[in-house]
Design a protein with these regions (language model features):
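Acidic/His/Gly-enriched intrinsically disordered linker/tail segments
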Residues: 200-261
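Acidic/His-rich structured neighborhood in mature extracellular/periplasmic domains
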Residues: 74-223, 293-294, 298
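C-terminal motif of bacterial Sec signal peptides marking the signal peptidase cleavage site
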Residues: 12-15
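Residue-level recognition of alpha-helix termini/interfacial anchor residues
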Residues: 46-60, 224-233, 240, 288
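C-terminal soluble interaction/assembly domains
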Residues: 247-315
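Sec-dependent signal peptide recognition
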Residues: 2-7
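N-terminal mature-domain "stem" immediately C-terminal to a signal peptide or N-terminal signal-anchor/transmembrane
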Residues: 17-78
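Structured segments of extracytoplasmic/periplasmic soluble domains
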Residues: 36-40, 103, 107-110, 205-209, ...
Length: 315
C-alpha cells in the first residue's frame, strides 16, 4: 500500500502544475525545515524557525549538538523518506497556504504575520504555533493507508491525507485568531455548533476549490448519510434537550472528532454538530448575504439563539 502513496500525490502534482500556469496564483514562503535538517543544511542557530521547531522536540537550550542529535533521530530517519515520496517539494503547501492567506485578506480576516515551515516530528499536533512560527508536520498527511497510522482508529486516519492539509491550515489559522470565547450560561451547545459552522464556512471560503465533504472531514458515504438524515438528527438534538445545554462535555460530544455521535443517532458520524452548525449558518447567509466572516466569528454573532431564529432553519 505504501507504494500507492506517490500515486496519491500524482493528482496533486497535476493540480499544482495547472495552478502554476496561472500567474496570479499567490504562493506563501514556506521553509522546508525537515528537508534541510535531513540533508544536513541546518539554518543558523539564530533562525527563528529553527529555534521554534527545536522547542517542540526538546526542552534543552539550542546548541549545535542538540540539532545534530535530532538529525539522527528516529523521527527524521523514518518519516523523511516517506514525506519526500508524497510531497516532492513545498509547492503544494506553499500554494495552498498562499491561496488561503490571500482569500483571508480579501475577506477582511485579521491574521497575524507569521513564518511558515514544514517539519516532521513525533508530536500529535499536525499544525502547531510556536510564537510567530506556524509549523506544519507533513508526517501527519501521508495517506489514510499509511502503515504508520495503522494503530489509529479509522476516523482519525481519514483525516491524514494530503487533501486534508489545506483545510487544516485554514482552520488552524482562523481558529487561533478567532477562538470560541463564550463562558458560563452563554456557552451553549447551540453557540458552539454555530461557531463550528462558521469555521466550516471559513474553510469553504478560504481554501481554493473547496469541497464541503473535505472541509468537514467526511467521506462521500458519510455526506450522503448526513444529507438523508439531517431532519432526524436535528429532531434528536431538540428531543434530547441538547441545544441549550451548557455542559462543555455535551458540546464536545457533538462537535469534537470521534467515531460517532451516539447521543444523537447511533450511526451519526463524529462532529455531526459541526455539520448542523454549518447548515444553520448557510441558511442564515441565504437571507443575510452581506454578513462577513469577521462578524460571524465574533462572540456577539454566535451567542444566544438569534442566528438560529433569523436563519429560519427548519428540518
Amino acid at each position: 500500500m505504501k507504494r500507492l502513496l506517490p500515486l496519491i500525490f500524482l493528482s496533486l502534482v497535476v493540480a499544482c502544475s495547472k495552478s502554476s500556469r496561472q500567474a496570479d496564483v499567490p504562493v506563501a514562503e514556506v521553509v522546508p525545515l525537515y528537508s534541510y535538517i535531513a540533508a544536513g543544511h541546518v539554518p543558523d542557530s539564530d533562525s527563528t524557525v529553527l529555534r521554534a521547531f527545536m522547542r517542540t522536540v526538546s526542552e534543552e537550550p539550542l546548541t549545535p549538538e542538540l540539532v545534530e542529535a535530532w538529525m539522527s533521530s528516529q523521527a527524521v530517519s523514518v518519516f523523511t523518506p516517506d514525506v519526500d515520496s508524497v510531497f516532492t517539494d513545498t509547492a503544494y503547501v506553499a500554494r495552498s497556504l498562499g491561496g488561503i492567506l490571500a482569500n483571508a485578506e480579501a475577506k477582511g480576516l485579521a491574521l497575524p504575520h507569521r513564518q511558515y515551515a514544514t517539519v516532521v516530528y513525533g508530536r500529535p499536533e499536525s499544525v502547531l504555533f510556536v510564537d510567530s512560527v506556524m509549523l506544519v508536520a507533513l508526517n501527519h498527511y501521508l495517506g489514510a493507508d499509511y502503515p504508520g497510522y495503522s494503530h489509529w482508529p479509522v476516523y482519525m486516519r481519514l483525516g491524514k491525507t494530503p487533501q486534508a492539509l489545506p483545510y487544516d491550515l485554514a482552520e488552524a489559522l482562523v481558529a487561533t485568531s478567532y477562538p470560541y470565547s463564550l463562558e458560563g450560561g452563554d456557552a451553549t451547545a447551540l453557540s458552539r455548533m454555530i461557531y463550528e459552522g462558521v469555521l466550516t464556512h471559513a474553510k469553504m471560503s478560504l481554501v481554493p476549490d473547496a469541497r464541503l465533504g473535505d472541509a468537514l472531514g467526511y467521506t462521500d458515504a458519510q455526506m450522503r448519510w448526513l444529507e438523508e438524515n439531517e431532519g432526524s438528527i436535528w429532531r434528536s438534538i431538540i428531543h434530547r434537550q441538547l441545544l441549550y445545554d451548557t455542559s462543555e462535555s455535551t458540546a464536545d460530544r457533538l462537535v469534537a472528532p470521534s467515531p460517532e455521535v451516539s447521543v444523537v443517532e447511533p450511526a451519526a458520524p463524529g462532529r455531526v454538530g459541526r455539520y448542523i452548525g454549518y447548515r444553520i449558518v448557510s441558511a442564515y447567509l441565504a437571507d443575510h448575504p452581506d454578513a462577513t466572516l469577521p462578524q460571524m466569528l465574533s462572540p456577539e454573532f454566535y451567542k444566544g439563539n438569534s442566528v438560529l431564529i433569523n436563519s429560519q432553519y427548519q428540518h
